[in-house]
Amino acid sequence: MKVLPLSKIHFIPHVHWDREWLRSTDSSRIKLVYFYDRLIEMLENDPQMKYFTFDGQTAALEDYLAIKPFQKDRISQLVKNRKLFIGPWYVQPDMIIPSGEALLRNLLVGSKYAAGLGHCMNVGWVPDAFGQNKITPYLFKEIGMKGIFAWRGFDYDVLDDSLFMWQGNGDASLPTVHFALGYGHYRGFPEDYEEVKKDMTDFIPKLEARYQDQEVLFMLGSDYAFPRKHSSKTIEQLQKDGYDCIMNNPEDYLDTLLNAAKKNHHQLKIYQGEARSAALGRIHAGITSTRIDIKNAMRHYETMMAKVIEPMISISRFQGGYCDQELINYFWKIIFKNQFHDSIYGSSPDSINHTVENRLLNLRHGLNELIWMNFRYLAESVDLSVLKENEDILVLFNTLPYQRNDYAFTSMIVKDKNFVLKRQDGTIVPYEIMNEVKATSHDIEYYNGMENFHDAGEVLEGTKFKVQIKIAASFLPPMGYEVLKVCFHERTSKRPEGD
């Protein structure tokens, strides 16, 4: 007599797509093009192939459409019809190394892209990050997600079920599904049906122990794993043999789990804070210190974007300057691509790490250009008619939303080492020269070229000293700027005071 499991089996066809890891982005893109071509045909032509989840991210789809833009309408139709599930991430990031601001922007950009194609999957999807951040529930809740699916970092000594409430910082909490055997425990059905039934016998008892409400999750896929053509027919055959099983998607499966828990009066356990245990899956703790040069550079550029460039653009826009959000998103996307989990881990061959470094170089040039562009727009709003022949201007910015009590450091090309800094009301601003050298012609051309929108021909006569000065920044307004006069041939004995 055949004994069937009491649980209902939910098969979720999916793929985890490493944009770059053992292979470069373009090597992976070649596989990606073939993958999506076949996937589109399968989802359109097999009515029983109801759903496919593409890793909770959108960058891979963007990579595909860069090669085949004419496929956009077909993709969009599948997304609208909830056959293909994408988003909310732009890329699958590490959850520990990037800043909270960068993680949130990643979600905002990815969810907007997915929604633009017809639908953003409304659950968080974190299959392969090496540990979980305590702000994760907060981030997903902020963008309207109804739950989370995650794997690494959790521990069954703490959790008694694969469905629980995850509470992050503050009061933010979301129902969370833990991949009990990992996100790729069943890459695909074997073609031999007898082998499939044996797998059911082996796997279901292990999974039933983790799903109290008898709604068992089978992850039908893994890294780069294409759905088997016979998947829908195999599920149909299992149903005929008495198995209670369906093909499902993350959104509907979460609803089913929560309804079952409510029906069974199952009080979900609350898990609080971060998840950094290696009990159920390796978290490779050592990756937090590999290629520290890349990690430090990424922190520098994500901080520059959030705390310097975007505030400057806001100030500039308030003054009538130009702001192109798509340009800002372009550079955020470069940052996100470097925060893709395998990229920021530095776990790839050196050839892949060189690609990461090249993106850092692009960020260096691009973000500096954004800063200078906004300098130019703001400079146009400054009244220069009050300047005398022996005066210049220095504009200092405070891009933070509060008053600063620290120092501002800046380098200038000046006509004379003896000068006084004055506010518009004539108040003298103390400063200290930290370093001074004679400016070369290259320094002078570069300095004036930046100042004059790369018109290096406008070299101010007499500029010959390059000085670095320190100024107490307490007089700068929050999210604002101050225009100082640089008065040459005057002296002051005052020194800056600050923390």
Residue ranges and their predicted role:
Residues 1-393, 399, 406, 418, ...:
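Catalytic-domain carbohydrate-binding cleft regions of carbohydrate-active enzymes
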Residues 421, 461, 481-483, 488-489:
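Contiguous transmembrane helix-bundle modules in multi-pass membrane proteins
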Residues 408-415:
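Short acidic, flexible loop segments centered on an aromatic residue
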Residues 399-403, 485-499:
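Beta-strand-rich N-terminal accessory domains
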Residues 463-469:
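Aromatic sugar-binding surface patches on proteins
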Residues 389, 401-403, 414, 464, ...:
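Short, surface-exposed loop/turn motifs at beta-strand boundaries within globular domains
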